[in-house]
Amino acid sequence: MELEVFAGQEKSELSMIEVARAILEERGRDKEMYFSDLVNAIQVYLEKSDADIREALPFFYSDLNTDGSFIPLGENKWGLRSWYGIDEIDEEIVTLEEDEDGAPKHKRKRVNAFMDGDEDAIDYSDDDPEDESFNTAEEDTEYDEEDPDDEKSEVESYDSEINEIIPDEDLDENVDLDEEDDDYSDDEEDEEGE
């Protein structure tokens, strides 16, 4: 493969991006190339080894994306931006996508949960099983009067728990409580609280 643009130049001095531009210009419009085919054509022209191409590939791909003269056309196809007018660029990309897909894409149907009479609408009113008990007719709840026997059993259970901690034998039944403590008065309490 010979490129007229580079006639008389050393191939070792050429960059991959220059060669890519020349290859695409020679092919002409509507002859976009897949990235892999473009890299293979560059490798053949520059007579570089696979190892050299693999090493330069990330830099070449970055240059291809940042150089303003190339345009990605979808599915890793590349062309020259000069082939397309500004208004034509979006149309060309859309056309390629439609041609490749074959069938137009279907839009998903949006569901409005508040629509009445729509069979597909989601009814959120019956989602929570806890709400089922509230949907039934409210029954009058009758509260029993306090049963004195219940109170006695509660007191006995508290007493038994206290006895487990402090047995009855250890309790001093003759504790005298002096309601008036000579060492402490209400006036001192007020002063400390302030």
From Swiss-Prot:
GO terms for molecular function: DNA-directed RNA polymerase activity. Gene3D superfamilies: RNA polymerase, subunit delta, N-terminal domain (1.10.10.1250). It holds the Pfam family HARE-HTH. GO terms for cellular component: DNA-directed RNA polymerase complex. Residues 14-83 form the HTH HARE-type domain. Residues 117-194 are annotated as: Disordered. The keyword Nucleotidyltransferase applies. GO terms for biological process: DNA-templated transcription; regulation of DNA-templated transcription. Keywords: DNA-directed RNA polymerase, Nucleotidyltransferase, Transcription, Transferase. Transmembrane segments: none annotated. Participates in both the initiation and recycling phases of transcription. In the presence of the delta subunit, RNAP displays an increased specificity of transcription, a decreased affinity for nucleic acids, and an increased efficiency of RNA synthesis because of enhanced recycling. Belongs to the RpoE family. RNAP is composed of a core of 2 alpha, a beta and a beta' subunits. The core is associated with a delta subunit and one of several sigma factors. HAMAP family: RNApol_bact_RpoE. This is Probable DNA-directed RNA polymerase subunit delta.
